[in-house]
């Protein structure tokens, strides 16, 4: 009996620190699978860090750098404008003009349609500072600004109100997506809206979006600027 108690006491004393501290005990032999795709949880942690950090390659500095490029081109092009030429700037909205970061975090980087509809209805999305700078620069030179968004037509009033509340005022047009064929791509829709602007007599000198599908297709702007967005993809 004494020997049994001694062994039990030895086991208790030997392993108690590990149990109490919650330290994992790694297996002596471990075979790991091949996982070419990074772990989703780790990627989400990296996205949070990328958004919040302040190094030159982080989210906010990258946004501002792209905005600076856009403003430089805008000033150059306005100076070269011909008499009577109608110049236009085209802007996407989500993650280009307005930030949905709070909602993205709330849904853990997923897309829940009802949540996004409720978020858009609140009209609380703040402006993306760099894009607002471009907008104000354009308006100061008399350049017309057109928004082309993938938001549905049902969100027109809420979207317009949110844009104005965020500081975007005195724009020329707001295009939202109505009923469309299921096979119509974002590029097809947005390039079609740009065609309407060109047909109205404007020269699109600058187009800014966070997705390549905001910029691809014809007619294209004379100069296009892609903003960073590793948070979601719209092909």
Task: Kindly give the residue locations of the regions a language model identified.
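Short, acidic loop-to-helix structural element flanking the phosphoryl-transfer center
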Residues: 116-146, 153-154
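Bacterial N-terminal signal peptides
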Residues: 8-19
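Positively charged n-region of N-terminal signal peptides that target proteins for export
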Residues: 1-5
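Non-catalytic pre-domain segments flanking phosphatase-related domains
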Residues: 18-91
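C-terminal cap/substrate-recognition subdomain and adjoining C-terminal extension
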Residues: 25-41, 45, 57, 143, ...
């Amino acid at each position: 009996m004494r020997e049994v108690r001694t062994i039990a006491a030895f086991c208790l004393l030997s392993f108690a620190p590990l149990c109490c501290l919650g330290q994992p005990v790694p297996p002596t032999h471990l075979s790991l699978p091949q996982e070419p795709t990074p772990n989703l949880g780790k990627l989400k942690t990296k996205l949070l860090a990328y958004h919040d950090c302040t190094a030159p390659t982080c989210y906010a500095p990258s946004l501002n750098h792209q905005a600076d490029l856009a403003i430089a081109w805008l000033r150059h092009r306005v100076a070269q404008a011909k008499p009577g030429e109608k110049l236009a700037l085209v802007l996407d909205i989500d993650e280009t003009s307005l930030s949905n970061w709070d909602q993205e975090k709330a849904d853990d980087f997923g897309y829940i349609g009802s949540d996004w509809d409720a978020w858009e209805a609140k009209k609380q999305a703040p402006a993306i500072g760099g894009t607002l700078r471009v907008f104000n620069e354009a308006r100061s030179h008399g350049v017309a600004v057109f928004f082309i968004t993938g938001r549905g037509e049902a969100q027109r009033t809420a979207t317009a109100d949110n844009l104005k509340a965020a500081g975007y005022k005195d724009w020329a047009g707001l295009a939202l997506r109505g009923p469309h064929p299921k096979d119509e791509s974002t590029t097809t829709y947005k390039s079609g809206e740009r065609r309407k602007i060109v047909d109205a007599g404007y020269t699109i000198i600058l187009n800014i979006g966070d997705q390549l599908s905001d910029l691809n297709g014809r007619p294209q702007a004379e100069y296009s600027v892609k903003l960073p967005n590793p948070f979601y993809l719209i092909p």
